[in-house]
Amino acid sequence: FVKTMMRLMKERTTLNVVSDQIGRPTYAKDLAIATIKIVNEVSDGKKIKGIYHFANKGVTSWFKFAQQIKKNAGLSCDLLPINTAQFPTPAKRPAYSVLDTQKIETTINIDIPSWEESLLACQKMLG
């Protein structure tokens, strides 16, 4: 999403972005770090059972996420909020898809960064 939005914001003067789908954007690098920590804990003999959700801290819409991408990159494309019905996709998307990360934070003792921090790190990595 980040790479695509940055590319489209450079190519276009206006971009429509869905504003009524809420979630927790997740940086793959943060997920990989959490996964490695879990593997290390299991290797050290810790019993870990059940389902654990991971996502960066904070909640946002795709539109607000795109606004932050634009701000971080210093781009000038106009972003227009639209609703899900105005942007049909083959797969139905949930309006609210926020994962609860309390279990992984407390059981594995993982400090999860905010999506804003991780987005900035991702954009710096992308160049």
Model regions and ranges:
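A hydrophobic C-terminal alpha-helical subdomain
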Residues: 86-107
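Residue-level signal for the nucleotide or nucleotide-sugar donor/cofactor binding architecture
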Residues: 23-26, 60, 99, 110-113
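Amphipathic terminal alpha-helices
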Residues: 115-127
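NAD(P)-dependent short-chain dehydrogenase/reductase
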Residues: 1-23, 29-36
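Glycine-rich Rossmann NAD(P)(H)-binding loop
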Residues: 17-22, 52-59, 107
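A general structural signal for well-ordered alpha-helical segments in protein cores
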Residues: 1-5, 28, 32, 62-66, ...
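Mid/C-terminal beta-alpha module of Rossmann-like enzyme folds, strongest
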Residues: 41-90
